């Protein structure tokens, strides 16, 4: 009998703390890495984490270089034209962070004439292009952290990202010194999606069912909460 190859789980090669980033030894660590390990164990799937450049991660999936994506990828109608998704495994708000005391608000009127930083090829870029592009300049970055660095240095006025990534930045020395959250943007499910799920090739229904069952298991048996506790003060599973 042929031995089944391990499933290659694609994560973004660009660090995205606290979800996935390399430690000093080059090992990938973070909440999403822990969840990958737990979901694969729950589904009795042998998995290997495979870093891929974010902009090429969907082509890597459809081209067969990886078997699944677990990289904080939001379930959106646009992406579902190309790939399929499991049930969601987290859903957090999209938030804007600015310099302390900026007086800005997380809407088009509040962003008028400002420069907003977003990570390229994300729902945050899509949202900013749809809702803020008439009022503000949108600047894209390869990583969320690069945008945060420019914000801290005063080169941009605001950065839009997932609330968890922003919380991690605001807990850092640089974030504490410079910046504050001005709150969540108005929801737009067409752009922001229905939460984050496992990206899969279309037609792989058996693998999708395996992931859905494994996600349900870690949610039900307390593993999800145990993994989350060291990283987050409240559940990020969402509505």
Question: Where are the model-predicted features located?
Answer:
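A ligand-binding cleft/hinge motif common to bilobed small-molecule-binding domains
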Residues: 56-59, 73-81, 127-130, 157-192
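A conserved helix-loop-strand patch within extracytoplasmic ligand-binding domains
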Residues: 45-48, 73-74, 87-133
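Extracytoplasmic small-molecule ligand-binding "clamshell" domains
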Residues: 4-72, 81, 221, 230, ...
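Periplasmic-binding protein-like
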Residues: 13-14, 91-98, 171-212, 232-239
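Ligand-binding clefts/hinges and TM-proximal coupling segments of bilobed small-molecule sensing domains
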Residues: 46, 123-139, 180-181, 212-239
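Extended ligand-binding regions for polar small-molecule ligands
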Residues: 33-42, 102, 110, 115, ...
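Ligand-binding cleft/hinge of the Venus flytrap
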Residues: 19-24, 36-45, 124-142, 148, ...
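Short helices/loops that flank or line small-molecule/ion binding pockets
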Residues: 37-42, 50-51, 55-67, 82-84, ...
């Amino acid at each position: 009998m042929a031995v089944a190859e391990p499933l290659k789980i694609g994560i973004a090669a660009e660090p995205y703390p606290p979800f996935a980033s390399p430690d000093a030894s080059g090992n990938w660590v973070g909440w999403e890495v822990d969840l990958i390990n737990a979901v694969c164990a729950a589904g009795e799937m042998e998995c290997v984490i495979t870093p891929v450049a974010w902009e090429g991660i969907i082509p890597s999936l459809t081209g067969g270089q990886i078997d699944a994506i677990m990289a904080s990828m939001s379930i959106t109608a646009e992406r579902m034209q190309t790939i399929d998704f499991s049930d969601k495994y987290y859903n957090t708000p999209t938030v804007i962070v600015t310099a302390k005391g900026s007086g800005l608000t997380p809407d088009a009127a509040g962003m008028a004439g400002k420069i907003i930083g977003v990570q390229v090829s994300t729902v945050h870029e899509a949202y900013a292009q749809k809702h803020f592009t008439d009022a503000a300049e949108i600047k894209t970055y390869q990583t969320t952290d690069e945008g945060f660095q420019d914000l801290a240095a005063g080169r941009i006025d605001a950065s839009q990202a997932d609330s968890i990534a922003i919380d991690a930045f605001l807990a850092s020395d640089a974030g504490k010194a410079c910046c504050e959250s001005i709150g969540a943007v108005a929801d737009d499910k067409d752009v922001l999606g229905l939460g984050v799920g496992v990206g899969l090739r279309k037609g792989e229904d058996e693998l999708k069912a395996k992931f859905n069952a494994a996600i349900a298991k870690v949610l039900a048996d307390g593993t999800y909460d145990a993994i989350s506790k060291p990283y987050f003060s409240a559940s990020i599973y969402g509505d």
